[in-house]
Amino acid sequence: MANKVEDLVNVILDSYKECDMTARIDEERMLNRDILIEIIDEIRKVLFPGFFDNNKVRSEYLKFLVGERLEFIQYHLKKQVSNAFANQDVCRECSKAQAEEKAEEVVFEFLKKIPKIREYLNTDIQAAYDGDPAAYSTDEIIFCYPG
């Protein structure tokens, strides 16, 4: 049985060489899908406090909570953007430090836009509610849109 498994391992390893588009061996990691999903979840919680949280959001802890979430988003998104830059033409000739610096700038510019994004969302939510006769509340719009 051990030889069969070893033979299979060798066949799979050969396939990594032959099908190199589907393997990234000894290369910097590109993007981490699981981390990106966590980042999106945290951004959604910042955009809609109290809607997608597991626990009640208390006003006395809101400043701490928002700060903690922004720190998480900034740290992890910076790493993901930096990895993307390192693997794209945007920053292919950059050093790792330059890619990280550029990523930090891009991420902070995005984070600075959160208040404006919230304004747009507020307007969009009201418009969706006004245009949907089946909607019972703006909360329903937030939970159900898009699809």
List where the protein language model places each region.
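Terminal amphipathic alpha-helical/low-complexity segments used for targeting or macromolecular assembly
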Residues: M1-P146
